[in-house]
Amino acid sequence: MTSTEPAAPTPRRRRGRPGYDQPAILRAAVELFNRKGYDATSVGDLARELGLTKPAIYHHVTSKEQLLGQALDDALDELTAAVTEASRERAGTTAYERLRAMVRRSVEVLVAHQPSVTLLLRVRGNSEVELAALERRRWLDDRLAALVADAVAEGALRDDVPPKLVSRLLFGMVNSLVEWYRADGAYDPATVADAIITIAFDGLARYEP
């Protein structure tokens, strides 16, 4: 069984005037949003963090909501590309193999973009920007669930656990990395990905009696 892949939601058009230090402003904003919370962070806080004036910040961005949207889109663009690439059918590959590849790529993206993914996982739909991000997250969940269903249909995975629940548990394992993973810690991304894949798929494997 092969699932029909829906098109990914289109990212919102980004606004604002480019500037040579705009990436630095965005990085500082993401760090502050994660540390203090988005609602508790003001443009004044960001200006003080960077040693700039508020007008200097507004020269490059129109609002802190624009910064939030840009950070969320950065994370979602990477995750969408990873999921789309890993789930694409190729000659000689099974849904089970593509599913494992999707989980591995998700770990790699989270590690490479940990601050923005951390921010993404904390949004609750309190604004249009956050609602758009949640819609894109749901698309990722649906793609993973569809691939789980295909792997079940192949007979590679057990069929007594709903695919949607499996997808949430898999993403839950991957997303937990934002709480404890450190790039300078004891484990590199490949080791973490191997551990998640082993623990998850050994438990999901279908064994013949």
Which residues does each predicted region cover?
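N-terminal intrinsically disordered/low-complexity leader segments
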Residues: 1-20, 87, 208-209
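Short, structured helix-loop boundary elements
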Residues: 22-23, 43, 65, 69, ...
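Helix-turn-helix
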Residues: 24, 28, 32-66, 70
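Short amphipathic alpha-helical elements of helix-turn-helix/winged-helix folds
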Residues: 28-32, 70, 109, 143, ...
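Short secondary-structure transition hinges
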Residues: 66, 101, 107-146, 164-165
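Hydrophobic alpha-helical connector segments
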Residues: 70, 84-113, 167-170
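Short, basic, alpha-helical segments at the C-terminal edge of helix-turn-helix-like DNA-binding modules
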Residues: 73-79
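Hydrophobic/aromatic-rich alpha-helical bundle segments in the mid-to-C-terminal region
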Residues: 117-122, 130-134, 138, 152-199, ...
